[in-house]
Amino acid sequence: MPREDRATWKSNYFLKIIQLLDDYPKCFIVGADNVGSKQMQQIRMSLRGKAVVLMGKNTMMRKAIRGHLENNPALEKLLPHIRGNVGFVFTKEDLTEIRDMLLANKVPAAARAGAIAPCEVTVPAQNTGLGPEKTSFFQALGITTKISRGTIEILSDVQLIKTGDKVGASEATLLNMLNISPFSFGLVIQQVFDNGSIYNPEVLDITEETLHSRFLEGVRNVASVCLQIGYPTVASVPHSIINGYKRVLALSVETDYTFPLAEKVKAFLADPSAFVAAAPVAAATTAAPAAAAAPAKVEAKEESEESDEDMGFGLFD
């Protein structure tokens, strides 16, 4: 089958990306640095039926999107984020589920000299199994060691590489000697596009519990501020009413002014013994049903004992 010419290929690519943008309301913009063709094929297979991966040149993706802005102006939000080695993952499924599937397809990778470290690398304290002749190599990297049973032992955990640092030749050699593959590569989500809105992928980690706690915290802050400045809101009005009632009650106690709810408080303040007497009455009211049930249990127990005694006498008659 003859290979299609470049003009036809471009035309088909434009049609494909536009169709995907129309058919799928959600997509990820993903970085594909250090992702090989074999790993990309594995990612496509794992997402089959749930998502579609589309890679391409940035200029072609931007051109296709700009040509479709008249029909879907919200796509303009994607343009500033199409830079570097990026692509799209289109889906109709739950975004968190697809994100987890992408993370599951990351593969461990050895450190290469000159590569930019995507994460911090720490060498744990361990017996390396290397001979004493390598001691100077560890000293050059500032790693404290000792010779234990003829092999080099690292005495404490060592932060070898920081995030964003360029991996040096010595660091890469050491990690390879220790059989440590510190990095993992795969499609990295850079932005999320969801029904016209674009946001950071960290938003996917927000749960309902987080939203609920943040909402309550906001309500408490609003109520506190409104109470201080005397500005009534839905959040502060209940507290304002309670505080107002307390002030009126205090004023009533100190003056001759009274109202039904204040009379009981005044009576207790005038005769504290009445308040003390009221407590046992309430307790007695609560205990009455239990007390009424107790004699019935005692009576039942006595009947049971009498029955047992009768049975005992019957055995020896």
Curated annotation (Swiss-Prot):
<comment type="subunit">
    <text>P0 forms a pentameric complex by interaction with dimers of P1 and P2. Identified in a IGF2BP1-dependent mRNP granule complex containing untranslated mRNAs. Interacts with APEX1. Interacts with FMR1 isoform 6.</text>
</comment>
<dbReference type="GO" id="GO:0070062">
    <property type="term" value="C:extracellular exosome"/>
</dbReference>
<dbReference type="Pfam" id="PF17777">
    <property type="entry name" value="RL10P_insert"/>
</dbReference>
<feature type="cross-link" description="Glycyl lysine isopeptide (Lys-Gly) (interchain with G-Cter in SUMO2); alternate">
    <location>
        <position position="297"/>
    </location>
</feature>
<dbReference type="GO" id="GO:0002181">
    <property type="term" value="P:cytoplasmic translation"/>
</dbReference>
<dbReference type="InterPro" id="IPR050323">
    <property type="entry name" value="Ribosomal_protein_uL10"/>
</dbReference>
<dbReference type="GO" id="GO:1990904">
    <property type="term" value="C:ribonucleoprotein complex"/>
</dbReference>
<dbReference type="InterPro" id="IPR001790">
    <property type="entry name" value="Ribosomal_uL10"/>
</dbReference>
<dbReference type="GO" id="GO:0005634">
    <property type="term" value="C:nucleus"/>
</dbReference>
<keyword id="KW-0687">Ribonucleoprotein</keyword>
<keyword id="KW-1017">Isopeptide bond</keyword>
<dbReference type="GO" id="GO:0070180">
    <property type="term" value="F:large ribosomal subunit rRNA binding"/>
</dbReference>
<keyword id="KW-0963">Cytoplasm</keyword>
<feature type="modified residue" description="Phosphoserine">
    <location>
        <position position="304"/>
    </location>
</feature>
<feature type="region of interest" description="Disordered">
    <location>
        <begin position="294"/>
        <end position="317"/>
    </location>
</feature>
<dbReference type="GO" id="GO:0005737">
    <property type="term" value="C:cytoplasm"/>
</dbReference>
<feature type="compositionally biased region" description="Acidic residues">
    <location>
        <begin position="302"/>
        <end position="311"/>
    </location>
</feature>
<feature type="modified residue" description="Phosphothreonine">
    <location>
        <position position="59"/>
    </location>
</feature>
<keyword id="KW-0597">Phosphoprotein</keyword>
<dbReference type="GO" id="GO:0006412">
    <property type="term" value="P:translation"/>
</dbReference>
<keyword id="KW-0689">Ribosomal protein</keyword>
<feature type="modified residue" description="Phosphotyrosine">
    <location>
        <position position="24"/>
    </location>
</feature>
<feature type="cross-link" description="Glycyl lysine isopeptide (Lys-Gly) (interchain with G-Cter in SUMO1); alternate">
    <location>
        <position position="297"/>
    </location>
</feature>
<keyword id="KW-0539">Nucleus</keyword>
<dbReference type="GO" id="GO:0022626">
    <property type="term" value="C:cytosolic ribosome"/>
</dbReference>
<dbReference type="InterPro" id="IPR040637">
    <property type="entry name" value="Ribosomal_uL10-like_insert"/>
</dbReference>
<dbReference type="InterPro" id="IPR043164">
    <property type="entry name" value="Ribosomal_uL10-like_insert_sf"/>
</dbReference>
<feature type="modified residue" description="Phosphoserine">
    <location>
        <position position="307"/>
    </location>
</feature>
<dbReference type="GO" id="GO:0016020">
    <property type="term" value="C:membrane"/>
</dbReference>
<dbReference type="GO" id="GO:0005783">
    <property type="term" value="C:endoplasmic reticulum"/>
</dbReference>
<dbReference type="GO" id="GO:0003735">
    <property type="term" value="F:structural constituent of ribosome"/>
</dbReference>
<dbReference type="InterPro" id="IPR030670">
    <property type="entry name" value="uL10_eukaryotes"/>
</dbReference>
<dbReference type="Pfam" id="PF00428">
    <property type="entry name" value="Ribosomal_60s"/>
</dbReference>
<feature type="cross-link" description="Glycyl lysine isopeptide (Lys-Gly) (interchain with G-Cter in ubiquitin)">
    <location>
        <position position="264"/>
    </location>
</feature>
<dbReference type="GO" id="GO:0042254">
    <property type="term" value="P:ribosome biogenesis"/>
</dbReference>
<dbReference type="Pfam" id="PF00466">
    <property type="entry name" value="Ribosomal_L10"/>
</dbReference>
<comment type="similarity">
    <text>Belongs to the universal ribosomal protein uL10 family.</text>
</comment>
<protein>
    <recommendedName>
        <fullName>Large ribosomal subunit protein uL10</fullName>
    </recommendedName>
</protein>
<dbReference type="InterPro" id="IPR043141">
    <property type="entry name" value="Ribosomal_uL10-like_sf"/>
</dbReference>
<dbReference type="GO" id="GO:0003723">
    <property type="term" value="F:RNA binding"/>
</dbReference>
<comment type="function">
    <text>Ribosomal protein P0 is the functional equivalent of E.coli protein L10.</text>
</comment>
<dbReference type="GO" id="GO:0005829">
    <property type="term" value="C:cytosol"/>
</dbReference>
